[in-house]
Amino acid sequence: IGVPDYRDEVREYLEIAVVGCDLRPGAKAPRLTELIHRAIPYPVILITRDPGGLAISLAHKRWAERQAGRIVIEDVESTGPLTKAVVDQAFIHDLSLAKQPTRSLFTLYQGWITRVQALHAARLSGAYAATDDQAVSDRRRAALDTISRLTREGATLRVKAAKEKQMNRRVDLNLQIQRLEAALVAARKDL
């Protein structure tokens, strides 16, 4: 395809593999996806199919810091099951090689990861908008991380509030939940 390979002190991308995998019903897709990414020593576009539908996952690879010659994966970015929703279809259309940055195999792979992150943002905001602007991508990634963290904290507080017997403590927990919900609204604006 004419895209130069990539080498630096952290990683080496000589090729990108596209791997397909059919998963059995009841398979633990996230764990299997991570294992496949760990097993293959170069960047992989993993397309999995299970009863829920097709999913695409990617994970940057880098040299291990303490073991020479060993490769470790960074965060696995997965689409989850793709549907016929407008944002999912916009994402699929945006995966074309012609729409990716091609300075190196690293930037090409990062372009696809950025599109997966844009899909996550679109599923929350309702509008798919991919960009290769690093500042926008970093802000989106931070907002997605914040939303994920706040959602987990909110779920934990709701469980505590449901179990709480003392009314004043329950009121305090509900106020904390309201503050988290306000922070979630603010974080969604950064998508």
Question: Language-model features: where?
Answer:
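Compact, glycine/acidic-enriched structural inserts
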Residues: 62-91
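Generic detector of well-ordered alpha-helical segments enriched in charged/polar residues
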Residues: 30-33, 37, 106-117, 151
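Short, charge-rich, low-complexity alpha-helical interaction segments
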Residues: 102-144
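Alpha-helical oligomerization segments
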Residues: 133-134, 144-191
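N-terminal, leucine/charged-rich tether regions that mediate assembly and partner docking
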Residues: 1-63
